Amino acid sequence: KQVTQFNEGILPWAIQNPVALVFDEYDAGRPDVMFVIQRVLEADGNFTLLDKNKVIKQNKFFRLFATSNTVGLGDTTGLYHGTQQINQGQMDRWNIVTTLNYLSLDKEMEIILSKNKNLNNQKSKEKVANMIKVASLTRKGFMAGDISTVMSPRTVLHWVENTEIFKDTGYAFRVTFLNKCDEIEKNTIAEYYQRCFGEELPESLLNIQI
């Protein structure tokens, strides 16, 4: 004998339990779909299951979090294609909004070394520190409007891993990040590299013959 049984989804289940539910990439959700959490965002918001004629009361320890690359206004930079503009009525219901900026050099170094134990020596630490400094310059350059591509901590980690593969820091930088950049910005980014490592890349103006 076969029996069809209804099981509640992740949201109804989480609401009834002492759970911290995180919506990752929240701004990638379609606004008409995200309306389902509108009532949940109220201080004592309950969740209604219309197909079961059931109202679910929130557990007093239930918490809802969300992460996004935008602040609900849509993609104003062109870097996060696929994100949506979030309904402002829903944005108004989030009682705390905070910004997570890039990590400090020491924290970023700690993460990279934790994933690459063999680099835990003085020489390797100096090299990784210079890599993070290059990334920091791209972030400042992006904020200043000088370049349109930025190095994330993930990119730095890939650069470190590729350096281990190719045994060449400059080449690894080019295939990890520089080749993704706009052609007219490559000289600026090559300059960032030169400032930190004291070496010229082929993309540097000094190596371009007119």
List each language-model region with its residue ranges:
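C-terminal regulatory/interaction module of P-loop NTP-utilizing enzymes
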Residues: 1-210
